[in-house]
């Protein structure tokens, strides 16, 4: 074999390189210029690739826009002021957080649905019939705004529902023999009223705290007593995961029903009245959240192990086309439907 290329080989090599470059430019130009051709673009563009397996962008788009619709309908139904651009934490907006969580979920759906097919966990005839029924129901019963926003078609919905059914099947297998108990103390939510008295806003906050405590222990309502001193009694549920000062949290959780006490933390005085040491309804909801988090941790760990053997390639450029710039529902849509 010759060590160096001759002139003809060099020309051929340059032609091949040019062709590859042109193809790359053509592929880049396939990206949608407007909403009209986005459905076609998303159908032909892979969002995830794992070996010879892939998931197209339209499936991820469908799942994400459905989630957007759910949140918008929920918040507008209950009259809550709502914006996707609300800052939440560390410079991120509500939209950022929902997109991140949804992206992780979609990636896990992809990995586990492919795992199911590779491990003889395909859907049974009954499960396939259930998918077909759900697809039909979605296409005939969904609000037209959801159909439009998700760019739904029978084929797309069928692909997504098949994937999520396979995902559910694997999740059931993962969770079959694991510990899914929740410590009651981890879930317990007490219901308290807290009066905060900072020396920045109150003269002699320690004396005010003592006076409020004395009045409450004499049978007066903490909210009414607090207003006498131009203070406010904030009524909240407190549990182990509540985002308040740790010392204050521990103090609240130590109180019994109808107990009122004061505590000083870093020069700030707090008067805390406990309505319920265990708000059962809220505790039940907190327990469900902890249970779902525990399930999610097992599933995520399983997916991460699979990814060590078969890494997932992510098309970040394609994912960046998915956002909540266009609402599925507006406040007016929900008001008119009620």
Which residues are covered by each model-predicted region?
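A generic structural-conservation signal
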Residues: 125-127, 235, 261
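N-terminal targeting/tethering segments
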Residues: 35-152
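Extended intrinsically disordered, low-complexity coil regions enriched in Ser, Thr, Gly, Ala
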Residues: 122-129, 185, 190, 195, ...
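Peptidyl-prolyl cis-trans isomerase
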Residues: 210-249, 281-282
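Sec/Tat-exported extracytoplasmic proteins
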Residues: 64, 71, 106, 110, ...
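Extracytoplasmic/secreted proteins, especially bacterial periplasmic and envelope-associated proteins
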Residues: 55, 59-62, 93-102, 106-114, ...
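PPIase-associated folding chaperone regions across multiple families
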Residues: 2-5, 9-43, 146-210, 243-338
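Short loop/turn hinge sites at secondary-structure boundaries
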Residues: 79, 215-219, 258
